[in-house]
UniProtKB/Swiss-Prot annotation:
It comes from the Bacteria. Pathway: Cofactor biosynthesis; thiamine diphosphate biosynthesis; thiamine phosphate from 4-amino-2-methyl-5-diphosphomethylpyrimidine and 4-methyl-5-(2-phosphoethyl)-thiazole: step 1/1. One of its GO terms (biological process) is thiamine diphosphate biosynthetic process. Keywords: Magnesium, Metal-binding, Thiamine biosynthesis, Transferase. Binds 1 Mg(2+) ion per subunit. Coiled coil: none annotated. This is Thiamine-phosphate synthase. CDD domains: TMP_TenI. One of its GO terms (cellular component) is cytoplasm. HAMAP family: TMP_synthase. The gene is thiE. 4-amino-2-methyl-5-(diphosphooxymethyl)pyrimidine binds at Q65, Y66, R67, N68, K69, N97, S136, K166.
């Protein structure tokens, strides 16, 4: 995997004049909904390598989610803290996958909850009114409605295509996105997304595309990220 130098990323940080502790989206509810790439980290056990691979990508994403199903508690804490330190100067929100306690401990910007995790109301109570709370809703519109009612900031649908990262029996379709335009929160599409197959999903209304291996496992992750962005016209 080719990873560009983090020099350009550091230059971006150096030019940042307003260092925020909370993403503007969280402080200003009248701002437009986020639209673009929602990057999710891979199961990387080397923290330095994780940071080196992630840093050059931050300029092109909307949100970052820390997800590592192989790490123990100590490593997860170490990596989450390192990613938070990386994200804060840029204003990119960091969410934690499936670990409400870790999100609260490090002061992350939010949490993403799956099928068997704490519900959105518990997460909202623990993380506060400004946290970004996402819920996996698979292909279930009613689950999405209940999640939003419980306090979810966004809902995730998928898998849209077969995925090697996370297998699931659920299949979502562009029609599902067209049926959920009324939900009033960002909808995240996930599952086997590539620059060649995302056009129908974007056209159907997905505000965010969640990607892991399509970017991190690419020969050139920055080039891959730009390919996704080009489909979003951003």
């Amino acid at each position: 995997m080719e990873v560009s130098s983090i020099g350009s990323f550091q230059e971006h940080i150096d030019k940042t004049t307003d260092i925020v502790t909370l993403h503007p989206l969280l402080r200003n509810p009248i701002m437009p909904q986020p639209r673009g790439i929602y990057l999710i980290t891979p199961d990387e056990t080397d923290t330095a390598r994780l940071i080196a691979h992630t840093a050059p990508l931050l300029n092109g994403i909307v949100w970052l989610q820390y997800r590592n199903k192989l790490a123990n508690t100590a490593l997860r804490t170490e990596q989450a803290q390192a990613l938070l330190a990386l994200c804060r100067p840029t204003g990119i929100p960091l969410l934690i996958n499936d670990d409400l306690e870790l999100a609260q401990t490090i002061g992350a910007d939010g949490v993403h909850l799956g099928m068997h995790d704490s519900n959105a109301s518990i997460a909202r109570a623990q993380l506060g009114p400004h946290a970004i709370i996402g819920v996996s809703c698979y292909n279930q519109i009613e689950r999405a409605k209940q999640a939003i009612k419980a306090g979810a900031s966004y809902v995730g649908f998928g898998a849209f295509y077969p995925s090697h990262t996370k297998t699931t029996p659920y299949r979502a379709t562009p029609e599902l996105l067209r049926q959920t335009t009324h939900l009033g929160v960002p909808r995240v599409a996930i599952g086997g997304l590539t620059p060649k197959n995302i056009a129908p999903i974007i056209e159907a209304g997905a505000e965010l595309l969640a990607v892991i291996s399509g970017i991190y496992s690419a020969k050139n992750p920055i080039t891959a990220l730009k390919a996704y962005q080009s489909q979003f016209n951003i």
